[in-house]
Amino acid sequence: MSDDFNDRRRRPAAFSVEAEEAIEREMEQTPRRAPGSFSEKVVMTPDAEDPFIGTTAAVESLNLPEAMPRRRRLSFGKIAAGAFGILISLAVGLWIDRLVRDLFSRADWLGYGAVAVVAIGVIAFLIVVAREVFGMMQLTAVQTLKADLAAAAASGKTQAARAATARLVHLLAGNPRTAKGRARLAETEGDIIDAPHLIELTERELLAPLDREARRIILGAAKRVSIVTAVSPRALVDLGYVIYESARMIRAMAELYGGRPGTLGLLRLMRDVIAHLAVTGSIAVGDSLIQQILGHGLASKLSARLGEGVINGLMTARIGIAAMDLCRPMPFRALKRPSIGDFLGDLAPGTARSEGSAG
């Protein structure tokens, strides 16, 4: 066996190595660049006269601070709505009771049929209410988990970080995009990792594929809004489609990150997104901002409708980023938060090329 092993060994071979003198000689023969100087005085262009700084400032002004859910507090409007809701429910109940009694007075089978219909309606209504309550609780659980992860990273307690990351793994267990990340985290259960690094590892392994999918969802919605705005004949059609696409995008974002909102949950998310945009003053885009963004060769080539399509697409992207902040179960730490500049090149390629040539 040892003889066979010796036969399989690589036979000795010879190869030439360049001498150090030859290498040094080759380096000496390489021509060196002679020192040079500027013939004219270098003049620094101030920011006020820079023709390209306007575009950068315009794009940066489109970026939003991270969206946070609004604080829920009891207001007089909610008290009034609850009181009138109870009153309307009692009125509906009395009307149904009177209707069933009248049907019984006419014929027993009509009365029993009405009772059966009312029972089916009540059961269906309770199921709908249960689903809505579960959806609202799921959204609240996501925000609670987000706060717990941030607190665990700030405190540095490994046990709290382990418990919070385990809850995150359980939340995303049904998403096949996180299978590889969950397996990777399972391998580190016995390792000694401090809390900030454990949370950053969890973010990279679990949320990186979800963030890529979220960016794809936002970009797809923004492109569809841009196309519809460019070809639609009426502004009302634009507004209706933007609302429809935004609601669809927000629901997809919530489902991607583990939330399953019902109708009330979706309305709550949309209200939080709109409130965030309103507070930051980011709902409307002025004509000067449009000219700054589309001014480098693109506005002169595109029609006004196409320019409006690009702007509406950017507004949709801002709504998507705000929805991503609200639905994501972790704050951005190890991964970069998306910005409007990430979508500007896809929505307006000419602008990206102009900025690249300017740089």
Swiss-Prot record:
Entry keyword set: Cell inner membrane, Cell membrane, Membrane, Transmembrane, Transmembrane helix
Main localization of the protein described in the UniProt heading: membrane
Entry's localization field: Cell inner membrane
Topology term for the membrane: Multi-pass membrane protein
Entries under InterPro entries matching the protein: DUF697 (IPR021147), UPF0283 (IPR006507)
Record keyword RNA-binding present: no
Transmembrane segments: 76-96, 109-129
Assigned GO CC terms: plasma membrane
Family: Belongs to the UPF0283 family.
UniProt-listed PANTHER family: UPF0283 MEMBRANE PROTEIN YCJF
Protein name: UPF0283 membrane protein R01807
UniProt source species: Rhizobium meliloti (strain 1021) (Ensifer meliloti)
